[in-house]
């Protein structure tokens, strides 16, 4: 996934770090194999749901685009049941 960096400020950074995910782990997620689950529109803003393996843990992230930069809005570690469900879905899609 190509992008021009991250959009961090006093609004989104504390919220993302508040779930125990480090800045390095969040950024590693997007520099590795990230899976885009879906987009939705909240108000006038398109939000994208993504997950992947970043810095040794499965991570779930809601983000939006600011130009070519990623603006994480909420980030957390995934629960085992979520990981299993999404990995199974990826396997099914890759078999097609």
PLM regions with names:
Residues 1-96:
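Ribonuclease/tRNase effector modules and their secretory precursors
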């Amino acid at each position: 996934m190509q992008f021009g960096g991250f959009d961090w400020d006093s609004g989104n950074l504390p919220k993302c770090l508040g779930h125990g995910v480090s800045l390095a782990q969040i950024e590693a997620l997007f520099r590795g194999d990230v899976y885009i689950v879906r987009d939705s529109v909240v108000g006038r803003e398109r939000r994208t749901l993504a997950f992947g393996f970043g810095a040794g843990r499965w991570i779930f992230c809601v983000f939006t685009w600011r130009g070519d930069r990623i603006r994480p809005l909420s980030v957390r570690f995934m629960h085992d049941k979520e990981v299993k469900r999404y990995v199974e879905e990826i396997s099914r899609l890759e078999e097609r």
